[in-house]
Amino acid sequence: RDKNGNVVNYNGNIQTCPNGAYQKEKSLEILREVLTTHPFDGVFCNMSGFLVVDYSGVYHGPCHCENCKRLFREQYGLEIPQKDDPGNLDYKKYASFKSACTKKYRERLVKTIREINPELAINNLDYIRTESATEIGVAQWQYSASSNARKTAGPLRERPADNASVDFMGFRYRDTSVSAPQLALRQWQNLANAGSVSLYIMGHLGNHQDRTALTASKPAFDFH
């Protein structure tokens, strides 16, 4: 919640924090359900943690939910800062608080997954995930996939590297794919630098209207 206690609602998507029931309890219940009913190879949890902006870049500030306020007050005897200000001494304590909360949640997440299946790959533990993407107003690097895969795999090409080719043009254009040559180039760069073929789309394969990414990426997936 924001400093006024309002829920952060972005077009029906509610932002949560690691100290709320959804991330602490429900997310693990959902994870346990899907991992015991479907044959997954690995897990990547996207955008968990303490988010302060929404997809449109609107700043909402630190979470002021009752759990966060209570825990921070118990540990530091302070109120949560109104805004993110690294120059504020209280904010530095809040940053430490967030780091500790995130670490605890991560430990519970890993424990849950390992109990279900020790062979499941977990992001940032068993493999490293990066992205090759475009965004409005951001300079483009045509060899992004090569750089990411090579950096992650290491000089001996021993570390599992998952560099996801992002289908969409930018968060404000999430339903429109970048060009087919761009998408194909990323996948072949991944393979040439000891990475895996990896595609990131919004939604799921069955209802994805712009099929450009699927068609362009298929030859690399077939080859791999």
Which residue stretches match the model-derived regions?
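Hydrophobic targeting/anchoring helices
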Residues: 41-46, 52-55, 83-96, 100-224
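Active-site-adjacent "subsite" loops/lids of carbohydrate-active enzymes
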Residues: 1-38, 47, 68-99, 107
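Generic detector of bulky aromatic hydrophobic side chains
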Residues: 47-48, 60-62, 69-73, 185-191
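Aromatic-lined carbohydrate-binding/catalytic grooves of carbohydrate-active enzymes
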Residues: 1-11, 52-68, 119, 125-128
